[in-house]
């Protein structure tokens, strides 16, 4: 979460899940995250600074911990560590203006899997195609391709990588490469879904009790 936006985040605890919805500063990337645990209560936590909270939690060496949730703060005492972290008041933070139900109800024209190693190879290729910050996904025959270039500019160095076999057709769809860098590669396998009508690309990542859904708006060519 803190990779995308680390200030002013609401975490909702409901139905045994810790849920958050955050967006990048330019709103081209939305992250909906779920962490499933054995919560026995419902509440909302208005966190002023996620990175600051994460740093203090990193000082705790226990694998599991119990944090007291008070009316305006989080409090911990144990294993030689004590801290009190103050929360924002209810209503101080607003959630991103996005209709998740609408997006979840989209018909996705194209779906495919990407693995962590392939994405990391694309990132390595970006050091060569350093003049652009765009990545294009498209099909060439029976192959899915990822191309780092800028089709709106001339004489731009480009790097193209075959991402695997494709049993579908996909016209070039462009994304901001920086948004891909913000993906948390928890699992080796990432499910990618594309709605070409609205130019929306979804990256689903699951690992044990964690679900991450990244929603990225496509760029103009």
Question: Model segments located where?
Answer:
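Long, charge-dense
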Residues: 90-109
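DNA polymerase processivity clamps
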Residues: 1-86, 107-221
């Amino acid at each position: 979460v803190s990779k995308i936006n680390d200030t002013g985040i609401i975490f909702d605890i409901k139905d045994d899940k810790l849920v958050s919805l955050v967006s990048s500063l330019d709103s081209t990337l939305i992250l909906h995250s779920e962490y499933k645990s054995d919560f026995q209560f419902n509440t909302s936590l208005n966190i002023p600074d996620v990175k600051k909270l994460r740093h203090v939690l990193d000082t705790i060496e226990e694998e599991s911990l119990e944090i007291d949730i008070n009316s305006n703060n989080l409090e911990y005492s144990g294993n030689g560590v004590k801290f009190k972290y103050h929360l924002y008041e209810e209503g101080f933070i607003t959630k991103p203006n996005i209709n998740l139900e609408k997006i979840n109800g989209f018909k996705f024209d194209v779906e495919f899997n990407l693995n962590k190693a392939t994405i990391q190879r694309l990132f390595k290729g970006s050091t060569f195609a350093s003049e652009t910050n765009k990545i294009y996904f498209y099909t060439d025959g029976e192959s899915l391709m990822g191309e780092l270039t800028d089709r709106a500019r001339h004489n731009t160095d480009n790097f193209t990588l075959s991402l695997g076999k494709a049993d579908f057709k996909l016209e070039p769809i462009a994304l901001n490469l920086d948004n891909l860098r913000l993906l948390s590669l928890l699992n080796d396998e990432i499910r990618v879904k594309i709605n070409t009508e609205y130019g929306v690309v979804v990256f689903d990542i699951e690992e044990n009790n964690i679900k991450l859904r990244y929603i990225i708006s496509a760029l103009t060519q």
